[in-house]
């Protein structure tokens, strides 16, 4: 006996979306991020770098530490924006968050590739960073649309400052890493501006200070581990 669709196009075993599907989708997304499966939609910025003399071992270690920090930042960005979007009830805001997360995938892939070029690896604590950031994103979204967008804007503002510091600290000879960080900084500025235009409000000073403290903890740990 065979089972066939009717002339109306009805499929008797078509799958209906269940209440746990969004959860399964987020778990799948997390596994893809943490497994290093991300691929960029845009060209690799480092490809445009001029050939330079080889880096010394010390320069490579320092550059790898900084790029590992940047990679952790992109893991956190994926989790943060997915968490914010998951709890957001405003469709336009949710789309803005998901669009930013999609662009950050490029950054994730670029940092991962550069770490490989430098003979290094991502942070061993990435699962912890992801889980914490996703939870933080959900909490930010529960604070309301204006604060949710304000959190996005403040996050990007602090990331811009952090990337500025990396541009000052990276070896001048490491033009490949510098090209990547420069492009990332430009993208973060656009994300911040988008959040502000969409209605993001400034966060209270204690919240901004707590965000900076958490960022310092993450960066100082990820540089080594």
UniProtKB/Swiss-Prot annotation:
Required cofactor(s): Fe cation
Localization of this protein: Cell membrane
Enzyme's top EC category: oxidoreductase
Residues binding Fe cation 2, per UniProt: 104, 156, 188, 191
Binding annotation for Fe cation 1: 74, 104, 107, 188
Top-level lineage group: Bacteria
EC number in record: 1.14.99.60
Disulfide pattern: none
Pfam families referenced in this protein's UniProt entry, alphabetically: COQ7
Reactions catalysed according to its record: a 5-methoxy-2-methyl-3-(all-trans-polyprenyl)benzene-1,4-diol + AH2 + O2 = a 3-demethylubiquinol + A + H2O
Keywords for this protein: Cell membrane, Iron, Membrane, Metal-binding, Monooxygenase, Oxidoreductase, Ubiquinone biosynthesis
Biased composition (Polar residues): 1-11
Cofactor note: Binds 2 iron ions per subunit.
A single BP term in Gene Ontology: ubiquinone biosynthetic process
Region (Disordered): 1-20, 181-203
Protein's pathway: Cofactor biosynthesis; ubiquinone biosynthesis
Compositionally biased tracts (Basic and acidic residues): 184-195
Gene Ontology CC terms, in alphabetical order: plasma membrane
Membrane topology qualifier: Peripheral membrane protein
A molecular function (GO) term: metal ion binding
Assigned protein family: Belongs to the COQ7 family.
HAMAP family the UniProt entry points to: COQ7 (MF_01658)
Known role: Catalyzes the hydroxylation of 2-nonaprenyl-3-methyl-6-methoxy-1,4-benzoquinol during ubiquinone biosynthesis.
Protein name listed in UniProt: 3-demethoxyubiquinol 3-hydroxylase
